[in-house]
Amino acid sequence: MHEMAVCESLLSAMEEAAKAQNFSRVTRVRLAIGRFAGIEVEALRFGFDVVMRGSLAEGAELVVLEEDGSAWCFDCCETVALSHRLASCPKCGGERLVPNGGTDMKIKDLEVL
């Protein structure tokens, strides 16, 4: 379950931000996660609760904003929106697609004290 490692990295990023911005508590974390990022949201929520225990983000609300995926279609030479990684091109039905959006996870913002 790599979501635990993701949560540990998230905690490290929050601790660095706390030092740089001089805050001591995180009450809410908003993450943008692409559909193709390979993150299982429920596993992430579980990991978040476990990893944040005893930290500056213990009890913080985790808000997940799911971002659509997109891909470049080699057949019609268009960037198209996709709901899942194995979908065919919605414009031409082609299957030669390379994901180019919705593959990452970003911290959108933190609510802090």
Swiss-Prot record:
Q: Which cysteines are joined by disulfide bonds?
A: none
**Biological processes per GO annotation:** protein maturation; protein modification process
Protein residues bound to Ni(2+)? 2
Q: Does the keyword Zinc apply?
A: yes
Q: Name one Pfam family in it.
A: HypA
InterPro entries membership? HypA/HybF
Q: Which GO terms describe its molecular function?
A: nickel cation binding; zinc ion binding
Q: Which residues bind Zn(2+)?
A: 73, 76, 89, 92
Q: Which UniProt keywords apply?
A: Metal-binding, Nickel, Zinc
Q: What does this protein do?
A: Involved in the maturation of [NiFe] hydrogenases. Required for nickel insertion into the metal center of the hydrogenase.
What family does the Swiss-Prot or TrEMBL record give for this protein? Belongs to the HypA/HybF family.
Q: What is this protein called?
A: Hydrogenase maturation factor HypA
Annotated source species: Xanthobacter autotrophicus (strain ATCC BAA-1158 / Py2)
Recorded name of the encoding gene: hypA
